[in-house]
């Protein structure tokens, strides 16, 4: 299997099917399948492919879902919600486990919130649509869109921060590409950002672009600027509107939804644009009212992450009443990182610990993050033991793996470069480059 498929979703599915065929031939139906990865793209693609392959052979075994070694804190929750939520949104999955590098009692509340949010959609108004011809949810290549001012095409998705509440505090680590300021220029408006301004209040100046709503679509032609934004829903995408979007190459769609099953509505809109041959760049937009930051992270990760893993979205815009805007900015960058559509920070692949972990995992993770958080784009695995560690951190560039009581081994890729050394001492001086 490895020589034919390599380390790919196709290889994972081929391996799984070998065992399932044996179970079927031996008349052993009591099987639940758990097929995971720390990479959400691989995890979702693999499970979707497995379901398709099983159905082709008339197999319908239950599935257990999880993003393995998801990590801790915001990143662990977002990564878990992206992978698990995308599949649950497809109607795939019978049990789930949220894997966090935290105390074990932290996992169940997160899992319950995740499932409860999916269940809120039950009994929703149907969304009438059909898949665009040629679209494959397994491969889910990024939708082709034209490039307008570095939005669309192969450019990484942009982040638009809603600052219409007048909050202009920013975190350097999660600084948005554009900010929406609403109707009027506040006195403390920063001068180094590209701005979205409601069209009727927009004045021509550098780095300021008009923002329209659906009822103002006929006014687009009256604004001669290189970039215009218009907020639309699926129901707004009439033939006439789509023709305007095709003709005006300066327009960017802010795709919004108020449907109880917002993922279905926004998916329908994207397939409608695909089928119509409309290559307008699309920013995915969502509104929430959450005072619980964890709930916001989970809901936004499911809603945005599912669409991004489908190959849809040239940017995201998240608004939440109930939290600081820096929190929503961080959440947006975390979602893009988890879907591998835009890398903005170091990624950590860390296990939830078990009885085989013979060192202080949580303290170690914190120290490694402190020493390496500036290494944008690097993937670091932090594993409790040698049993599963090297395999489950296979996607990492570097690895820190338990080897015995208070002892660890260091990996560069899949190669062990230092064995059985005392834990933590190699990061007690972050300036030591030989170990990084």
What are these regions (language model features)?
Residues 1-18, 161-170, 175-263:
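Active-site beta->alpha loop and helix N-cap motifs at the rims of alpha/beta catalytic domains
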Residues 2-148, 227, 237-375, 379-382:
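Catalytic alpha/beta core domains of metabolic enzymes, predominantly
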Residues 89, 386-392, 396-412, 416:
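Nucleotide-binding motor/catalytic cores of P-loop/tubulin-like NTPases across gene-expression machines
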Residues 91, 151-153, 311, 372-375, ...:
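A structural signal for short secondary-structure junctions
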Residues 142-167:
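N-terminal basic/disordered segments at the start of proteins
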Residues 418-422:
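Short acidic-hydrophobic, aromatic-tinged amphipathic segments that line or gate anion-handling sites
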Residues 425-436:
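Residue-level detector of conserved catalytic or cofactor/ligand-binding positions
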């Amino acid at each position: 299997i490895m020589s034919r498929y390599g380390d790919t979703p196709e290889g994972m599915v081929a391996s799984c099917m070998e065992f399932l065929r044996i179970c079927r031939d031996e008349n052993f139906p009591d099987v639940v399948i758990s097929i995971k990865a720390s990479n959400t793209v691989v995890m979702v693609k693999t499970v979707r492919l497995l379901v398709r392959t099983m159905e082709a052979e008339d197999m319908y075994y239950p599935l257990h879902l999880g993003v393995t070694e998801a990590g801790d804190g915001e990143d662990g929750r977002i990564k878990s919600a992206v992978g698990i939520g995308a599949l649950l949104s497809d109607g795939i999955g019978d049990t789930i486990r949220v894997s966090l590098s935290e105390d074990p009692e932290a996992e169940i509340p997160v899992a319950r919130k995740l499932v409860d949010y999916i269940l809120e959609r039950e009994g929703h108004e149907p969304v009438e649509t059909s898949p665009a011809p040629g679209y494959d949810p397994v491969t889910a290549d990024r939708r082709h869109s034209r490039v307008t001012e570095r939005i669309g095409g192969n450019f990484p998705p942009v982040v638009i921060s809603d600052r219409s509440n007048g909050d202009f505090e920013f975190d350097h680590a999660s600084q948005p590409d554009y900010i929406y300021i609403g109707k009027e220029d506040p006195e403390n408006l920063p001068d180094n950002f590209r701005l979205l301004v409601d069209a009727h209040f927009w004045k021509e100046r550098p780095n300021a672009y008009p923002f329209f709503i659906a009822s103002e679509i006929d006014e687009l032609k009256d604004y001669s600027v290189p970039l215009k934004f218009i907020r639309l829903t699926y129901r707004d995408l009439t033939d006439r509107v789509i023709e305007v979007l095709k003709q005006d190459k300066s327009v960017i769609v802010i795709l919004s939804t108020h449907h109880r099953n917002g993922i279905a509505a926004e998916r329908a809109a994207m397939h409608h644009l695909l089928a119509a041959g409309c290559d307008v760049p699309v920013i995915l937009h969502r509104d929430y009212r959450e005072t619980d930051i964890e709930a916001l992270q989970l809901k936004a990760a499911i809603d945005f992450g599912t669409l991004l893993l489908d190959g849809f979205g040239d940017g995201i815009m998240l608004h939440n009443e109930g939290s600081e805007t820096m929190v929503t900015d961080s959440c947006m960058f975390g979602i893009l990182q988890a879907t591998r559509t835009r890398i903005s920070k170091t990624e950590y692949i860390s296990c939830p610990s078990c009885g085989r972990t013979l060192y202080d995992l949580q303290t170690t993770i914190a120290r490694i993050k402190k020493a390496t958080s500036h290494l944008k784009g690097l993937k670091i695995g932090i594993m409790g033991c040698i049993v599963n560690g090297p395999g489950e951190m296979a996607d990492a560039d570097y690895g820190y793996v338990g080897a015995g009581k208070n002892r660890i081994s260091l990996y560069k890729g899949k190669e062990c470069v230092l064995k059985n050394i005392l834990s933590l001492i190699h990061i007690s001086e972050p300036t030591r480059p030989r170990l990084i």
